[in-house]
């Protein structure tokens, strides 16, 4: 039986099913028995209490699924060779580089720091792109 958005996510029950604003929450989002928001098995109020706010929380399952969706869309709609590229400026971290690499994505970087972070996170150098202007000789050599 197929579940509707409403049955899967009662807190999104009033969203238009055709709206681009549907399913904005991570795929593991749920309400616990006390109607507290939970993502990836972690109650968000507990995370806020422990780490303070504002707090940026990512759901690994959602990141992995999104990476796969981009790769699959390119494979389906573009006959030539392609490589979906993660924009490291969104979150230049070892974990995000590792997740993107593990799902077959490439990565764009704007600095030596982003390149080094991606390499340390497991992103193969041949799947990285250095872009932007005003690059130092060291950054160009590293790329």
Residue ranges and their predicted role:
Residues 1-142:
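A charged N-terminal "starter" segment
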């Amino acid at each position: 039986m197929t579940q509707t958005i409403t049955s899967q996510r009662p807190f999104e029950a009033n969203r238009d099913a055709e709206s681009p604003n549907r399913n904005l929450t991570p795929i593991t989002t749920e309400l616990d028995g006390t109607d507290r928001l939970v993502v990836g098995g972690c109650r968000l109020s507990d995370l806020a209490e422990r780490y303070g706010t504002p707090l940026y929380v990512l759901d690994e399952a959602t990141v992995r699924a999104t990476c796969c969706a981009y790769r699959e869309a390119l494979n389906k709609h573009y006959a030539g060779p392609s490589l979906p590229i993660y924009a490291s400026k969104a979150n230049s971290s070892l974990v995000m580089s590792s997740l993107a690499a593990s799902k077959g994505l490439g990565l764009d970087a704007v600095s030596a720091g982003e390149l080094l972070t991606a390499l340390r996170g497991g992103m193969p150098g041949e799947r990285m792109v250095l872009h932007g202007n005003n690059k130092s000789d060291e950054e160009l050599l590293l790329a």
